[in-house]
Amino acid sequence: EAETFEAELAWLLLNQRCAFNSPVWFNIGVDGVPQQASACFILSVDDDMDSILNWYAEEGRIFKGGSGAGVNLSRIRGSAEPLRGGGASSGPVSFMRGADASAGTIKSGGKTRRAAKMVLLDVDHPDVEQFIWCKALEERKARVLSDAGFDMDLDGADAHSVQYQNANNSIR
């Protein structure tokens, strides 16, 4: 059975009837590299700082392995909601800023490809409007900076000043 599978798989690949995902090409059979073959991981984040910081760390490890990650941030309370120890919550959009910067810094699989990232927020979350507008406002900023002569190309010298650009945001 193994020989038949190998022959059929080789035929499919050589005749371009199928192709492996990026993590397989980057990782499998490469010495010193995590043998991570999944293209995408779904993460969970709870409404506490340990969980949020763990989300950042998990995404970093996933991106390093050449894979992408998706996360629904709806469990994080809205901005201005009260915290146990006093004060108000920052809300999910503020935590997206840190995760976005991390994704922009870590090249997927150590290669030149940027990390693949999806962020979801439920339509009934109190910060849904802020979530919708955060990326649009930053893209407007990028156009203004580009018109003023700043290098806003994808890997341009000044593109790092634009936030929320490393994820596909979606309302659920």
Model-predicted segments: where are they?
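Extended catalytic cores of very large enzyme megasubunits
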Residues: 1-172
